[in-house]
Amino acid sequence: SINAKSIGRNYNHKEIEYLDTGSITRGKIEGFQSVGLEHAPSRAKRLVRNNDIIYSTVRPIQRHYGIVKNPKPNLVVSTGFAVLSCDEKETDANYIYYFLTSDEIVNYLDMVADGSTSAYPSLTPDVISNIDILLPSLPEQKSIASILSSLDDKIDLLHRQNKTLETLAETLFRQWFVEEAEEGWEMGKLGDVI
């Protein structure tokens, strides 16, 4: 289902953790806004459950999407997201997520959004629900998603290692050439040695 749950009159949390479309990119959350319900943005309406896929309906090419894992009970997301809840008996949410975040689908959704009549590129949740998808058996979906998830984890690890190495190189450069230049080193013009 899409957008199955929203805040209603019986919503019992006074404080919410709000996620807007600009605070998540390619599954990475930059942060939540903790806010009292009475002061929440007007778009703070969508409720999410574990393994729901959130996909921004505005400018799909910006890749504001993610999959919800172990949400706090008071997590609320923007109505700018389509919230997709998978039928766990038939589909693996991670498989659907990888499908929806593939370049081919993102580019297709961006093309549809660009053709919209609104003031900015956007699409309706119906566009997402009407995408054709090949569904292997549930065990195959889980296997495919597991492999892709493992590759994503390795890519994330490599990015973190690169950041660490860049920081180390910068520190060593500063230490060797700025802070602790050897007394015996001669100062000269670069043009004299090249």
What residue ranges belong to the model's regions?
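Generic alpha-helical structural context detector
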Residues: 56, 82, 97-101, 110, ...
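A short beta-sheet element
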Residues: 44-105, 118, 124-125
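Hydrophobic residues in beta-strands and at strand termini
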Residues: 21, 86, 133-135
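Non-catalytic DNA-recognition/assembly elements of restriction-modification systems
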Residues: 1-10, 130, 134-194
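A short glycine-rich beta-alpha junction/loop motif
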Residues: 75-80, 116-145
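Sequence-specific dsDNA recognition surfaces
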Residues: 1-53, 68, 191-194
